[in-house]
Amino acid sequence: MSIQDAPLLDSANMGADGILGVDSLSSQRVVFDFEGQTMSIVPSQSAEAEKEPGSIVVKAKRKKGRLLMTDATANGRNVTIVVDTGAQVCIGNEALRQKLTARNLTDPLEKVQLLSVTGERLSGDYMFIKELVIGGVTLKNLAVVFTDAHAFHQLDLDRKPALLLGMNAMRAFKKVSIDFANRKFRVVLPEASELDIRMASAT
């Protein structure tokens, strides 16, 4: 595969020497082993690997190279989840915030700024979602920044409640496997607590 044109980004904004786009992962599986502190990219797997003790698989659909999960709720309100390993913190859109704040389901904590890989700064409200349920997975006290991120417009999700699932959520698990070809999001729950995963606040 040859690339004729590629964007040139400032490494100070990326925090790395480069970024691997989702377009290169269409037949791959990305595995984050948070206990072993490793990340690996391997071919999509068969169902046998899903038998690891403590694992839960959530089916997803693909849209513009990303995995979306619709079997999800935030504080009891329906929400579309977008897997986003490039986001350090979970990001919610304005439609989701309106759903939650209309019934006092969450309270704003403080104003924050996010820095994108292109150097763009986004202002947002930093809050906690008390409970996020994705398939058979429940996350408690999830730190979220609500802002008008470009990804929501790109995926036609700017007018319906949606959440970019960032790395602060994924680090709650022992392992996370994102299988783009088979459209599956698999997590391995930590042994200490498989029912009540408490989220550490993002910084």
Go through each PLM region and give its residues:
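Pepsin/retropepsin-fold aspartyl endopeptidases
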Residues: 1-203
